[in-house]
A protein has these predicted regions:
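Extracellular glycan-recognition regions
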Residues: 1-211
Length: 211
């Protein structure tokens, strides 16, 4: 470190007393597992980056060819990361749908029994609110997909406005203001998925743009 006036070097220590953030990250992106852990093998069951997530799913592991392998034998197998500071954002991943009742993305999670879900189920795109054991549909629309299809899902939350895009096109949207902040991740109902990549990106709320 150089002095401001004479250019002399100053040696010493800098102590950071606290470090935090507010709001959702500008862009938090995870690539494929092999990009993040080049030493990964098909038998690797955990990594340092996997430990940044909390899982209530039966199985949550790094996948050798994508990023995550997630399975759960019953409804509501949830995996999340993030904090209560995450408010207006979009969460995105490329998901391969295997045999399951429903699967997709989670946002604004306050634990694994209170969150918004955006899933593909029974030829429909569905946005729902999970509150304890009760699941309430916010909006749904027809969406053609087959078992073993791979689709890019993006779940965007801007204030009370919720929308799910499939392969870059809005599939369903609705409004609810029960949850205004919380973490993001995945949900699997009675089945399994592969998830290739994971991105959380802050969005500028329309309310802020008007101010």
């Amino acid at each position: 470190m150089s002095g401001a006036a004479g250019g002399s070097r100053l040696d010493g220590s800098v102590i950071i007393k606290s470090l935090d953030w507010s709001g959702a990250p500008e862009c938090y992106r995870m690539g494929r597992s092999m990009e993040m852990t080049p030493t990964l093998t098909p038998w690797t069951t955990t990594t340092s980056w996997l430990k940044t997530f909390v899982s209530s799913a039966d199985h949550f592991c790094p996948d050798y060819t994508t990023t995550f392998s997630i399975s759960h034998a019953a409804p509501n197998g949830v995996v999340t990361t993030g904090t209560m500071d995450w408010d207006n954002y979009s969460v995105k991943s490329v998901i391969t749908f295997s045999q399951q009742d429903a699967a997709g993305l989670v946002a604004r999670a306050k634990g694994h029994r209170r969150y918004y879900g955006a899933v593909l189920k029974d030829k429909k795109a569905v946005i729902y609110k999970q509150c304890d054991a009760k699941r309430t549909v916010v909006a749904e629309a027809a969406c053609d997909f087959e078992i073993d299809d791979t689709r890019e899902l993006a779940f965007t939350l801007d204030g009370p406005r919720l929308s799910l895009a499939v392969d870059g096109k809005t599939a369903v949207s609705g409004q609810d203001e029960s949850y205004l902040c919380g973490g993001a991740g995945f949900v699997v109902d009675s089945g399994a998925i592969l998830a290739d990549g994971f991105e959380v990106k802050r969005i500028c709320s329309r309310r802020n743009k008007k101010d």
